Curated annotation (Swiss-Prot):
Keywords noted in UniProt: Cell inner membrane, Cell membrane, Membrane, Transferase, Transmembrane, Transmembrane helix
GO terms for biological process, alphabetical: lipoprotein biosynthetic process
Gene name per UniProt: lgt
Topology class, membrane: Multi-pass membrane protein
Organism of derivation: Polynucleobacter asymbioticus (strain DSM 18221 / CIP 109841 / QLW-P1DMWA-1)
Keyword DNA-binding assigned: no
One term under GO cellular component: plasma membrane
Protein's UniProt name: Phosphatidylglycerol--prolipoprotein diacylglyceryl transferase
Amino acid sequence: MLIHPQFDPAAIRFGSFAIHWYGVMYLLAFAQFLLLGRLRIRAPRYQTLGWTYKDLEDLLFAGVLGVVLGGRLGYTLFYMPGYYLANPLSILKIWEGGMSFHGGLLGVLCALLWFAKKRHTSFFVVSDLVAPLIPFGLAFGRLGNFINGELWGRPTDLPWAMIFPMVDSIPRHPSQIYQLLGEGIFLGIVLWIYSSKPRPIGRVSGLFLLGYGICRFLAEFAREPDAFLGLLGLGLSMGQWLCVPMIILGVYLLRRNSTDT
């Protein structure tokens, strides 16, 4: 049985100034986006369209805004609408926590739509470029969750069960690690390999939606449901229900007829 190390929430301290682990993880996620994105734009499709490193920087800036705004609004709407309707100013208190991946994804989709319109290109050309870069960024986010000892798993007696002392003394699934490995590293490698060859437009995006939806859906069985929501219909969590439309849309994009590469 393992015990969570209870890391200092600050990665670096300079007197009273501290850089928290979340900040470090965000920076690493942004850096990998630019580094791997530089490799992605070397593909013939993007070379033909004249993509440059400046385009990646603009796309990252728009994506960050989408993640923050969408993630926060998604959390307020999907998870705690009653509380935030009664306390609307609390929506601005991002430092208190409360971000939704699915809301962040919707925010990123809006950012991609804006960027595609700005570049006079197809939305799926842009989303196919970005899709293989997202899982590795998510992996850093899940590592941040683990370091901070949050989003822990359900009780279990498996050999690798972990006690999170900040919660209780019950051995639990280290669900953050499951998600890091599944929707992060594994999905990232699959998408990177799949996208290394020319694919019909929308297929890479479809594989991301399907792959993330399945990985997250399965991981939720090991993750402790939100205390204020619990399990919903059919014994599924909110996260699992939000994955259902992702899986359906992913299957549709992978199966639709398209020969344009």
